[in-house]
Amino acid sequence: MVVPGILTSDGAGVNLRRIIGSPQLNMLDPFLLLDEFGTNNPEDYIAGFPPHPHRGFETITYMLNGKFHHQDSTGNEGHLTDGSVQWMTAGRGVIHSEMPEQTEGLVRGFQLWLNLPKDKKMIPPAYKDIPAENIPRVDFPGGTAKVIAGEFMGATGPGQPHTGMFYYDIELQSEKELSIPVIDGWNAFLYVYEGIVLNNQTVEKDQLAVLGKTGDCRIKAGGLGAQFIVVAGEPLNEPVARGGPFVMNTREEIMQAFNDYKNGILV
């Protein structure tokens, strides 16, 4: 299954491409949303993401290029720069902002929403800045991989999710091949942000491919090489109720989250 991203906007008008969380792919358990943001035009990102709430999941922001500033209601503050990751566990509730620290130049990256299991949706919120130099880089014949979470070729990523998952950023040279082990039963996908990938089908730039649930995933780069993220996770197989910035298990829990936010007791 190959899914194209759709152009939309979020925050205070940040233009982006939504891949998971779109009509074509509402979710891929445990992944709730995948956005790619990427532009040289400051008008597309300068308004940023002013303070807004979350409850019930984790956000993983991977910045390929650019500078953003994070602040949240727990007192955490961080700076996203080229190649860095921001890992935030919303848990029972957090209010945060993500605002650009640049007025010109390229901003590019991804935000992934990872669902929390039912028994962890109300854990205390947490935040972790992961600078680029703390993300392991693995060199292999024909390419490189950055390991954000999980294990790959002996390297372990610094991300610590509350459910089983891995997250790699991979660059493959022209027509080189790679086999990526995926645990049977996990949901996995790859998203191509440069070049073309072949995986029993052609996956072009700005497209996501849902991978098989059994065996290793074999990937071959096109003639110009390819850059892509590969992500896999253990499905939670639990009810999912969504309400804007909140993701819980029932509509009643969503209404409670809205009421808590309205009454100033979300955090």
Language-model region placement:
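Jelly-roll (double-stranded beta-helix
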Residues: M1-V267
